[in-house]
Amino acid sequence: AEVWLESAAGAAVSLDGRPYEGRLRVIQQADGLLVVNHLPLEAYVASVVGAEMPSSWDREALKAQAVAARSYALAHMARPASRHWHLGDTTRWQAYRGLSSLSARTRQAARATDGLILSYQGGIVESLYAANSQISWEAHGQLGASMSQQGAQALAARGLRYGQILARYYPGASLARLRQGKA
């Protein structure tokens, strides 16, 4: 059995005191309840940026994080983690905290890079990243390219733009824009 929770127009849906954008799908399973947040991709990206990086960081680092988060999410939408959801909300995937990690700066980073992803040879890059270069290497070294979030901040502080930052961490990848289809 399942239930969908929706709020009144423009309001948030809350669960355990945490507000979420979009709708919540509550699914009864043998071991308890599974709650899945369904929301627009760009709202998800803005929340991930704020959960993964301090919103006070340089705007270019936040934009690089937005592109990496969007690319990672889309790579996983192509091969979902389960039949009920694409990504978890922990750092195993990408940290996601609903509306609690949003700020004007994280929304602006998502908006400024709206629809931009990392692409390599026509595919979407599973843009791995971690807090710093040591963690990035330990967690993803054998997999290839991975962004250090602290490194991205340092590069942004030196004046590099988000595209230049991403090029440092994902060699050979290029920025591509998603086609927005009309339904």
Sequence positions of predicted segments:
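Conserved, single-site charged/polar hotspot
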Residues: 1-183
